[in-house]
Amino acid sequence: MKINHKYEFDDDVASICESTAALTEGCRLPVRMHKTDDWPLAEIVSIKELDGRRQFYVHYVDFNKRLDEWVNEEDLYTRKVQFPRRDGSQTGTSTGVTTPQRHHSLAGSVSRPTSPQHPGSGALAAIPQTPTGASGSVPPPAGIPNSVAPPGTPSSGGELVNGNNLAAALQKRINRKRKNHGGSAHGHHSLTSQQQQSHPHPTTPQTPTATPVHVTGDGLISGAANDDGDGSQDGKTPTPRQSGSMVTHQDDVVTRMKNVEMIELGRHRIKPWYFSPYPQELCQMPCIYICEFCLKYRKSRKCLERHLSKCNLRHPPGNEIYRKHTISFFEIDGRKNKVYAQNLCLLAKLFLDHKTLYYDTDPFLFYVMTEFDSRGFHIVGYFSKEKESTEDYNVACILTMPPYQRKGYGKLLIEFSYELSKFEGKTGSPEKPLSDLGLLSYRSYWAQTILEIFISQNPSTDGEKPTITINDICECTSIKKEDVISTLQNLNLINYYKGQYIVCINRVIIEQHRRAMDKRKIRIDSKCLHWTPKDWSKRSK
């Protein structure tokens, strides 16, 4: 057994089970990860009692939240536990026998509801309200438990932040932002993204050796070499905008926990990764059944069958603007097809972390990619974009459904978004910061697209090496200048040689690029795109 953080392991199961009665929300200890023999450090987010046994919802520290899970008492290693303190002082460690003083509000088992109440027609924002106790469970104590602390909140001194202090600080910050931005952070759709992994710093360019391919250009960087479109060069995580579709994420215990056990979408049964504000009565069911055409949700397969007998849709609503072979794209107006857009956001939230979901979809367009067969058009993925973006964002949110991941559909969505930008005659970029998976996909797409431009360059008639500028690359690809520069830096292709910047590509990079391109069997064909850009500033949204 591999226990991280140098914790010793005690095989006495009885003592472990006996000591778990002292554990409260906010405690940190090694936990056995599901289907592995690893014991990473985890934080207890919530506790419930089921059939006389306590179960613990844990978040593995430094791991993605999609790995969070319910574990049993025997999966906890209680030899060393970090207990949260009421006063927020230095967190101590306990070795099995010693237990902290427990507060009355946390005595016994505390079971939190799995989902907030679903907002009615009068409440558009899908922000969780104060939850009510689920049937058959003990309602949570009044106020915020002092032992609850989100992961990542401990200070550099090893302290765990007190729950009440955290709530007060969070409320102050929210009020301050409202005052600064005039409340613009509210009333907008969406799915904001926080970067989940640090960006590597570009290595220092060296004098190039003899390489077979050179692409040069005077003033290639022209003072903009330090600009990184995704904030990767300075090592800082960029802050999301407080307007448009980028709004702050309000983290609490309810939204930190997965509230849907399983969904059935067409032929696929999918286990969700994150919280989504579906109605609470549905979240208590073992599975939520979703119509793959209109995305309406039902509590049982029988209810879904009745719905399918009445549902006339066999494809997403809106206009089909692209079709090649079995792949189609539909453009959906968030104002004209509001119910579908809201259901799409609910579905996407199950697989997108660090998002705050709002039901105001009017300012957005949704582009849904489908795969066609004899039964209809089945959703593969989608991306959304603002009708009017002041910062030239061509993607607000992007998702490939889990059954279709690792098949090239993610890059196809990205390629289609840039194809739309080409039709609009401008460069575009995704809203930043990107998620971990989104960052990997975009960096891979940018690298392959830019290398494809370089390799296709031919020497001039007099035998001189080909030249190209950053602006030329942007014009050919519709990739924003900052993203082009950051990609060249991440690939370490930019070198300063004899008074000018040059891009050096060796045979190894060329072979790697060709192997990667061979895997991209599906590409966007601009001839199959039938679409005319609209000037949304001159029409009602």
From Swiss-Prot:
The modification N6-acetyllysine is found at residue 355. It is an enzyme of class 2 (transferase). GO terms for biological process: chromatin remodeling; DNA repair-dependent chromatin remodeling; double-strand break repair via homologous recombination; negative regulation of neuron apoptotic process; nervous system development; regulation of DNA-templated transcription; regulation of gene expression; regulation of synaptic plasticity. It is found in: Nucleus. InterPro entries: Acyl_CoA_acyltransferase, Chromo-like_dom_sf, Chromo/chromo_shadow_dom, HAT_MYST-type, MYST_HAT, Tudor-knot, WH-like_DNA-bd_sf, Zf-MYST. Residues 24-77 form the Tudor-knot domain. Its EC number is 2.3.1.48. GO terms for molecular function: euchromatin binding; histone acetyltransferase activity; histone H4K16 acetyltransferase activity; zinc ion binding. SUPFAM superfamilies: Acyl-CoA N-acyltransferases (Nat), Chromo domain-like. A zinc finger (C2HC MYST-type) spans 288-313. Residues 234-248 have a biased composition (Polar residues). The active site is at 431 (proton donor/acceptor). Belongs to the MYST (SAS/MOZ) family. Catalytic subunit of the Tip60 chromatin-remodeling complex which is involved in DNA repair. Upon induction of DNA double-strand breaks, acetylates phosphorylated histone H2AV in nucleosomes on 'Lys-4' and exchanges it with unmodified H2AV. This is Histone acetyltransferase Tip60. The lineage of its organism: Eukaryota, Metazoa, Ecdysozoa, Arthropoda, Hexapoda.
